[in-house]
């Protein structure tokens, strides 16, 4: 029989403290208030004093309310019925569908044993040239999208969700504005992609503690789908909101703050989520792509700074485009030698020419006279930005490579490209 405690020692915001024994860290409890029952989670143990984070917040909680410990950690339902559905950070439906209570699985478990993993060796096609051609997304990779506020990172995630060649999409939203939540819902529904998608959404108006549940729920469900043989892409936005929720709760708990007020375990908390990316030897895979906004466009901010040490590269979103010089996929060399024989050479030389174009723009802004070569670079840069960097471009990898050759042919002679003659002879457009 579960014990019921009817005396709350203290209430500090959404954190309550009770005296109890036989309780474990992370255990769920039910707090019965005059407004109804609310879940709470144990987040601190100090002798017989147990601190709990109340999901619905501390408003309406009084010291005489009952607290009943449930003897289990937070769980989420797993089945094919998740697809096409939308849930909040407590696992309850946000849509008009029924609550799912069968086949409950724990969240926040350990990452997969390395002996069960295989090396990343397959690409995920997205139809976005700046990803497929220049910074290939690889199965089981963990990548952040570094972005400033105001950049179209949610639009980019929605496009990837619609176009990525995977079996299942798990979309996790943390601190979303309600308009952004509706954008994801409506966009995926209209594109017919919601049927292969499960959404777990925490909006800015929801309790803070639910924000911390979103990544764990997404990754727990994704891992189960992967074990069942599915290739799963987990899309998370925004990990900075997740870190800010950690910071808020740490302050309430009076933890000693670290860099800019974030808790000292920020790195390990982020790593615990990203390390769930996996490619099983005899099953499916989990790939993680997560937006990390940079306050003030500051890449040294603790959240993007710590993230960079965990992940396998990054996409850097700037001025509405994936910036080629700030972006990097450290695993692309595992797959871009298997796509087409011109992939690597074309990728390297197009970026090299684009760097020369940027230098030419700087010379032009300083009033230098433009040479014939400079004029070619200016023409090339404009075509490269509109044909390759524009995020509205949606073409398969092979068509993107052909477009790359077409752009080169319109701006340069064969000899000026710097690409091996055998590749030029094979792929140079006829006219």
UniProtKB/Swiss-Prot annotation:
One of its GO terms (biological process) is proton motive force-driven plasma membrane ATP synthesis. Keywords: ATP synthesis, Hydrogen ion transport, Ion transport, Transport. It comes from the Bacteria. Pfam families: ATP-synt_ab, ATP-synt_ab_N, ATP-synt_VA_C. One of its GO terms (molecular function) is proton-transporting ATP synthase activity, rotational mechanism. CDD domains: V_A-ATPase_B (cd01135). Produces ATP from ADP in the presence of a proton gradient across the membrane. The V-type beta chain is a regulatory subunit. Belongs to the ATPase alpha/beta chains family. HAMAP family: ATP_synth_B_arch. This is V-type ATP synthase beta chain. The lineage of its organism: Bacteria, Pseudomonadati, Spirochaetota, Spirochaetia, Spirochaetales.
